[in-house]
Amino acid sequence: MNAIGIKIKKADGNHDPGASKFFGAPVLPDGWAELFSEDIIFFGQIRLSDIAELDTENKLPHTGYLYLFLDVEMYPYQAMAFYYDGEPNVVVVDFNKAEVQFAHLNEDWLMSFEPVDEDFDGTRLFGVPSSGYETDEELLLQFDPLAESTGFLDNIDGYAYFFFGEDEDRIDGIRFGIDRS
């Protein structure tokens, strides 16, 4: 089983707004920004061409963008995932500002990718959950809140997970979970 490690670093200065990243300003297709209420936060965008060579099992499309959002109105948070097969063109500055608890998540944290073992302890795509989190669901993304100082869920000593949906459209049914080790 292949897994893709994600290294993150806070963007400094000029960078491509369409880059793969956590938090900050998403670059969305025209008309999408109006679809989100103030209870929705932007978690991340992955430019799928960035991982195409590393996704040897073709778990995701290799063109376009995968977007991850969280509905934080109630706990546990609900995942919202969208795939767009094109080039988005609208930068949405301060997307997370309206949600007071997450207003600080308006800086871009850029992603870089590398192959890792399926049980790598850290932020990654695919593989198996690191902490012994028991599930039959297939892992899309494991996020380590303590790996960097993003300020997201940094009060837990564990992981945040996004799991693929079980239906034919595996992106539409993505589920979010937290493991407090």
Protein language model features and the residues they cover:
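Preference for intrinsically disordered or flexible, low-complexity segments
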Residues: 1-181
